[in-house]
Amino acid sequence: MFINSHLATGYLLYKLNIFEKKWFPIWILSAWIPDIDGLWSSSVVEHHSVLHTQIFWIVLCSLGWFIGHLKKKLNIKTFFIILFIGTFAHLFTDYITARTVGIKWLYPLNDVDYFLYPIIPENGNIPIWKMLVPPYLTFYFENKLLTAFEIFLNIIALVLYFFSFKKPN
């Protein structure tokens, strides 16, 4: 899934109004942060590092939440709850829209990539920055259902954004 779609997912989670408005940036960042591994990945296929495994986020967020609990700091606990929800949403949407690499749901117990639709790993043997140009971009949009899903997420987020402002009296 492209970054804009992950950001849209974070925005949609924020719009559920689970926590106060001050947490908006954390919702957005948490839905995107697993993709930071693209900065050190040499190819699209290698882009799903430990940051794309649920065990990493379960351990990190549990430890963070527990520290917040011990210190009796609600903000710390809230931060790690949002981080967990956002990163899990990221992994789930990557699982749904996988084209070249799936999600290792059971890592480190096994190294199997799980995906909803068939993937073509060899199409991901390109530098991560070449995702935005053909031929990868053309390949990415071949699956019309997955493309429609991403476009739908973005449209819903934009509609909610532009129509959620209160109108002056």
Spans of model-derived segments:
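N-terminal membrane-targeting hydrophobic helices
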Residues: 1-169
